[in-house]
C-alpha cells in the first residue's frame, strides 16, 4: 500500500514537464491510477508518505506552469485522499488561511482543490464561521466562473447545506448579496445558479428559515421573464416545481414545511393566470406548457387540496371543453379527480389508443379504477395495436386490484400476453414493454395470479431466449410516469 505512494512521490516530480511526450503523460497517469486503486480498499491510518503525496499534489496544483499531466485524474486522487483521511488530519495539511488563498487564486485548479476540501469537511458546518463560504458564493454567482468551478461549488452546497450553520452563513450573513443578485442581476445564467442554490438550501430548510423576500419571485420578475427571456421563465417554473416536490416528499418528517407552499399561493395563481391567458404569450404556449403542467401535477398531489382546487376552479378549469382535458386527466392526481371531478371520470377512460394515458393515470387509484374497469374489456384491448396493449398492461400490472381484475376477468388478454407467437414483436420497444408487464405480474403472489403464474414464468424465459444476444434493460418508467 505505502509503496505506491512512495513511488509516486519519487517518480512524479521527474515527469512534470510543460511539453512532455505521450510517454511521460502515460507514465504519470499510471502512477496516479495505482494510488487511486490502492485507496479503494484502504481502511487504515494515513501515513507520513501519504501526507507527502498530498503535499506534492498541492504544489502541482499551485504551480503557474501547465504540466503535461491529467489534472482531472490528479483531482480525483486528491478527492479520494480527502475522503479517506480523518478531517483533523486534513486540517494539518490545509489551513483555513491556505484554503482562502487557494480559493482567491487565479489558478482554477486551486479553487477546485479548495472545493474538494470544503465539500468533505467533517462536520459539514466546520467552515461556517470562515470567509470560505462567502468567497464560494461570490465565485458561484460570478458570470465569469467556469462550468467546472461552478459544478465543484455546487457539490459543496449539496454536501454542506444540510448543516444549519452553513445555511445561516449563506442565507443570513449573505442575505444582502443574494438579494442584490436576485433583484438586479440581468444575467440569466447567474440568476439560474441562484435558483439552484436556493433549491439546494430548501431541501434541508426548516420552515422558520423560509424568507419570502429571498425564496419567492415577484410578479414583475416573472412577467419580465415571460416577455423577455422564456428560458428564465422556464427556470423559474422548474424552481417552484422543485420546491413543491421537496415539500411533498418531506411531508411526513417535516410537515410544517407545507406553510412554504401557502406562502407561494399568489405566485401559483399567477402561473395559473398565465396558463389561462397563454394565447397572449406565444412563448409560453410553444415552449413552457410542459413545465407548467409538471408544477400543476405536483400541486394536485398535496393532501391539502385548497390551493390546487383554487387553481383549478379559477384558472386551469378541468372540465369538458378544455383543450387540454386529456392532458390533465393523464397527470393530475387521480385521487383529486375522484374527489372533485367524478362525473368526468365516469365519462372518460375508454380503451382506445387516444385515451391510454388517461387509463394509466386513473389506474393508480383503486377508487378510480373501480369506476373505469367496466370500460376495460378484452375485446377493446385486443383491438388496439400490440404496443398500445402493452403500454396499458404495464400500468395495470403494478397494482393488486388491477392485477386481480386482469387475472380473473380478462383471460383473453392474459392468453395473448403469454402467447409463444412473437412475430408481432417487431421492435425492441414493444419487446421491452411486454417483458416489463410479465416481470411486474410474476412479482405478485401465486395466489393472486392463479393459473397464470406458471405460463408467465415460461413466457419470461422465452422472452429472455428471444433476445439473448441483446441487453434486456428497460427504460419504460422514464417514458411513462
UniProtKB/Swiss-Prot annotation:
Which BP terms from GO are recorded?
mismatch repair; proteasome regulatory particle assembly
Q: Where in the cell does this protein reside?
A: Cytoplasm
Does the record carry Transferase as a key word?
no
| UniProt keyword terms in alphabetical order | Chaperone, Cytoplasm, DNA damage, DNA repair
Please give the chief subcellular localization of this protein. cytoplasm
**According to its record, what are the GO cellular component terms?**
cytosol; nucleus
On whether DNA repair is a keyword of this UniProt record, the answer is yes
InterPro entries in the cross-refs: HSM3_C, HSM3_N
* GO molecular function annotation: protein folding chaperone
Pfam families per record: HSM3_C, HSM3_N
Similarity field: Belongs to the proteasome subunit S5B/HSM3 family.
User: Tell me, what does this protein do in biology?
Assistant: Involved in DNA mismatch repair in slow-growing cells. Acts as a chaperone during the assembly of the 26S proteasome, specifically of the base subcomplex of the 19S regulatory complex (RC).
The protein's name in its UniProt record: DNA mismatch repair protein HSM3
Q: List the source organism.
A: Candida glabrata (strain ATCC 2001 / BCRC 20586 / JCM 3761 / NBRC 0622 / NRRL Y-65 / CBS 138) (Yeast)
Amino acid at each position: 500500500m505505502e509503496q505506491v505512494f512512495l513511488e509516486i512521490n519519487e517518480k512524479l516530480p521527474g515527469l512534470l514537464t510543460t511539453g512532455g511526450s505521450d510517454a511521460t503523460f502515460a507514465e504519470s497517469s499510471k502512477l496516479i491510477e495505482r494510488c487511486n486503486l490502492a485507496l479503494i480498499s484502504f481502511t487504515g491510518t494515513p501515513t507520513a508518505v501519504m501526507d507527502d503525496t498530498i503535499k506534492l499534489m498541492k504544489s502541482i496544483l499551485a504551480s503557474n506552469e501547465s504540466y503535461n499531466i491529467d489534472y482531472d485524474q490528479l483531482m480525483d486522487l486528491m478527492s479520494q485522499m480527502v475522503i479517506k483521511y480523518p478531517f483533523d488530519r486534513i486540517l494539518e495539511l490545509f489551513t483555513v488561511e491556505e484554503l482562502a488563498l487557494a480559493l482567491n487564486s487565479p489558478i482554477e485548479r486551486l479553487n477546485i482543490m479548495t472545493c474538494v476540501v470544503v465539500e468533505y469537511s467533517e462536520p459539514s458546518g466546520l467552515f461556517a464561521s470562515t470567509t470560505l463560504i462567502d468567497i464560494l458564493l461570490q465565485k458561484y454567482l460570478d458570470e465569469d466562473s467556469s462550468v467546472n468551478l461552478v459544478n465543484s461549488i455546487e457539490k459543496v452546497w449539496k454536501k454542506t447545506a444540510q448543516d444549519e450553520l452553513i445555511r445561516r452563513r449563506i442565507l443570513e450573513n449573505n442575505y444582502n448579496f443574494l438579494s442584490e443578485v436576485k433583484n438586479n442581476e440581468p444575467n440569466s445564467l447567474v440568476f439560474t445558479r441562484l435558483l439552484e442554490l436556493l433549491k439546494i438550501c430548501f431541501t434541508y430548510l426548516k420552515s422558520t428559515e423560509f424568507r419570502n423576500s429571498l425564496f419567492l419571485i415577484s410578479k414583475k420578475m416573472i412577467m419580465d421573464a415571460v416577455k423577455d427571456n422564456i428560458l428564465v421563465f422556464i427556470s423559474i417554473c422548474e424552481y417552484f416545481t422543485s420546491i413543491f416536490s421537496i415539500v411533498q416528499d418531506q411531508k411526513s418528517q417535516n410537515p410544517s414545511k407545507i406553510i412554504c407552499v401557502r406562502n407561494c399561493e399568489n405566485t401559483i395563481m399567477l402561473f395559473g393566470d398565465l396558463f389561462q391567458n397563454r394565447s397572449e404569450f406565444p412563448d409560453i404556449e410553444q415552449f413552457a406548457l410542459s413545465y407548467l403542467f409538471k408544477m400543476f401535477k405536483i400541486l394536485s398531489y398535496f393532501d391539502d387540496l385548497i390551493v390546487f382546487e383554487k387553481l383549478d376552479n379559477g384558472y386551469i378549469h378541468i372540465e369538458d371543453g378544455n383543450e387540454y382535458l386529456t392532458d390533465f386527466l393523464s397527470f393530475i392526481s387521480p385521487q383529486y379527480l375522484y374527489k372533485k371531478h367524478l362525473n368526468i371520470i365516469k365519462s372518460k377512460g375508454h380503451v382506445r389508443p387516444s385515451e391510454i394515458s388517461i387509463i394509466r393515470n386513473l389506474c393508480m387509484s383503486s377508487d378510480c379504477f373501480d369506476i373505469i374497469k367496466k370500460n376495460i374489456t378484452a375485446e377493446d384491448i385486443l383491438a388496439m395495436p400490440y404496443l398500445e396493449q402493452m403500454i396499458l398492461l404495464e400500468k395495470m400490472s403494478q397494482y393488486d386490484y388491477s392485477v386481480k381484475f386482469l387475472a380473473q376477468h380478462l383471460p383473453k388478454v392474459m392468453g395473448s400476453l403469454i402467447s409463444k407467437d412473437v412475430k408481432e414483436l417487431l421492435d425492441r420497444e414493444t419487446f421491452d414493454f411486454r417483458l416489463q408487464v410479465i416481470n411486474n405480474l410474476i412479482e405478485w403472489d401465486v395466489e393472486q395470479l392463479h393459473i397464470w403464474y406458471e405460463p408467465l414464468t415460461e413466457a419470461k424465459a422465452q422472452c429472455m431466449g428471444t433476445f439473448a444476444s441483446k441487453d434486456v434493460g428497460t427504460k419504460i418508467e422514464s417514458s411513462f410516469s
